[in-house]
């Protein structure tokens, strides 16, 4: 197993690869932000380490929806169009979708942002 494979496996099994933030104000909107396959580039040990481990990088963090109360950031550290989910528990698109249904159930408006790999998961969410 390469060093890069070990790093990704460690983050996949021990990290949620999800960040949830709240505005503190009661609002009826939740926003879901899905990373693209541009989470890190090029695909090298050093770049993956800096982006995922050192910086704990999620995309869209500077473009938060201003009228959302809850912000859910997800990342696909394998850059496989979310086919392996986001971690070892939520290890498929279907499991991520079911988990998100619980996370958004108390909101009447849902905004979802994603491009590239994130767009694939966004399309799956829209169907459900």
Q: Where in this protein do the model-derived segments appear?
A:
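Hydrophobic/aromatic beta-strand patches that form the interior of the parallel beta-sheet core
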Residues: 30-32, 70-75, 111
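Catalytic phosphate/metal-binding cores of nucleic-acid and nucleotide-processing enzymes, i.e., regions
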Residues: 98-102, 111, 128
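Short, surface-exposed "cap/lid" segments of acyl-processing enzymes
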Residues: 3-68, 80
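Alpha/beta-hydrolase fold nucleophile elbow
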Residues: 105-115
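Catalytic micro-motifs at enzyme active sites that drive phosphoryl/nucleotidyl and oxygen chemistry
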Residues: 60-62, 99-100, 121-124
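Cap/lid segment of the alpha/beta-hydrolase catalytic domain
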Residues: 66-88
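Alpha/beta-hydrolase active-site loop
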Residues: 83-104
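Glycine-rich nucleophile elbow surrounding the catalytic serine of serine-hydrolase chemistry
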Residues: 114-126
